[in-house]
Amino acid sequence: MKLLIFDVDGTLVQSVERADSKCFAATYETIYGKPFPTIDWHQFPHVTDTTILQTVIQDHFGRALSESEKHAFEQKYMELLRYNRRKQPHHFSEVAGARAMIHRVLSMPDTLVAIATGGWRKTAHIKMQHVGIPSQAFWVSGADGKTTREAIIEESLEIAHRIEQRFSKIVYIGDAPWDVKTTRNMQLDFVGIRRRGDREVLAELGATHVLQDYLDQEVFLEALQAAEPPK
């Protein structure tokens, strides 16, 4: 049995001109009346919704983020995600071939599929369902109650091991430099996706298999089989 763990943003779904990142910033500015500092996620200690919000709250107000505050932010953020998708649905799409590829791996009897995203679980469902990815068909691990990407993937692994004790191969599929860093730290096999074709971004960081999209399903499946941890 193989385990495939997918990231969401930039890996399965994409938005025009980083619309979802801008949506996160707009939610913050609406609630707190202060400018959101940056949507360059490299500037944050961990690229998860929880850590990003905690960091900005600490910087602006010198205090920790409460659970009720996080919940209120998430609700407003989800409202804006849904509104934007109703208003401009074509601005939010799958990475080319992602939906068909997910359906294919879900149909493979020797493969278990999971999601581990730096976003919150409910927001990930909104993004995937908008493009027709059946997010109810697999477990989604997100930043709910977790601050690091390692912790998110660990949750996904823990749940998978309840279903199957041993896997012949475990592969994480992601698009960002922090995905390379995380899988190297955890010594997980990795396949990179760079939808703009700039594969060197991840290759230069040590990723050995980087594709542009999922349009050639056989090439993607071959990459999964050959995947190894980033060097």
Question: Model-derived features: where do they sit?
Answer:
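Substrate-recognition element of Asp-dependent hydrolases with the DxDx(T/V) motif
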Residues: 98-129, 139-147
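Conserved Lys-Pro-Asp/Glu-containing loop-to-beta segment of HAD-superfamily phosphomonoesterases
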Residues: 152-180, 184
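A short, structured active-site edge motif that brings together acidic residues
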Residues: 40, 69-74, 134-148
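Acidic, Mg2+-coordinating phosphoryl-transfer loop and its flanking beta/alpha structural elements
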Residues: 172-212
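N-terminal helical cap/lid subdomain that shapes the substrate entry/recognition surface
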Residues: 2-8, 12-100
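Short amphipathic alpha-helix with an adjacent loop that forms part of the alpha/beta core around
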Residues: 217-229
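Short acidic-hydrophobic, aromatic-tinged amphipathic segments that line or gate anion-handling sites
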Residues: 141, 209-216
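Extended hydrophobic secondary-structure segments that form protein cores and membrane-embedded regions
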Residues: 6, 42-44, 140-142, 169-175
